[in-house]
Amino acid sequence: MKRLALASVIALVVVMALPPLQVVAGESLPKVEWICVSTETTPSHHTVVDVAKLAEGVAQRTGGRFSIRVALEGELGFKRDAYVRAIQRNQVQMSQFDPGWLTAQIPHLGVFNLTFLQDGTLDQLMKIEQATRDMSLAAFAKLNVFPIAWYSLTTQELISRDPIPDFTDLRGMKVRIWRELDAKLIERMKGVPIYLPGSEVYSAMQRGVVSAVNTGTPAMTDRSLQEVGKYLYRFGGPPASHYLVVNLQAFNALPNEYKRALFLEGWSLTDRGRETVERVDGEAVAKMKRAGVQELKIPSEQRAKLIKLAAPLWDEWAKQSAENRQALEAAKKALGL
């Protein structure tokens, strides 16, 4: 793992030492067209907007000769469960990889999803990413991909049609979830977890298939959940996060000038993501309040009980593999636990 990380750094230093690409010189370079798949279904979602800015930046840095099309989930005829296969086959050259659904291929990424292990702040999430980065780089290489950016989304909250008097006893309430560990926690809270893709949550909530939805606040407003939900609970679940990865063969085939453009824009995306997440959360909450949604906090005594309910799930998860155990130990050390 250390050799992989060192090799990546050496390659990056070589690429970054190149002089900036001039548009005139770029006329002799090949035209390259890539496709990037997003995990979102709406073009206005902040991660789609931010990745589109990366694509624009790459095009500008290469005189328009390296273009990246950002496709929404489902736009190409397949959804996120096929993203790994699509990028491995070079059907797409770039993809958002979310640890929330990538645990089937890289189980140790589940450390990002351990509810209440961290407090939901970006600083703590970054500590977990840094502590497990060598493990992740090695795992990505086995999938034939390489990350050029990493960024967080907002914390995972709950929007409900009905008030929730006691979070330690949901009394059979059906809650939409999308991560396995969240499902286990909802069960411990005496609720019923229901797996649903984001594109189906509005109609499911409208028809009563679920009474509450677990997701980030921007996703709530992107899917108009303020029309069917009336109570926003600051659950503070682990934020989703994205690695933006590229196909290794497609990347290696690029001229060094294009690689440099990707790295520079990848760094910009990582920095931009930090600023975006706070802004979009505030905007989404304001929009929901205008629609009559009440923003509520979970009482401190209930939250303390929820942490006790969640903690055994961390150890249960860690026992599944040596990699999981290593990731949890690294995360705890980084967080001072």
Regions found by a protein language model. Give the residues of each.
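Short, low-complexity disordered leader/linker segments with a strong preference
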Residues: 1-33
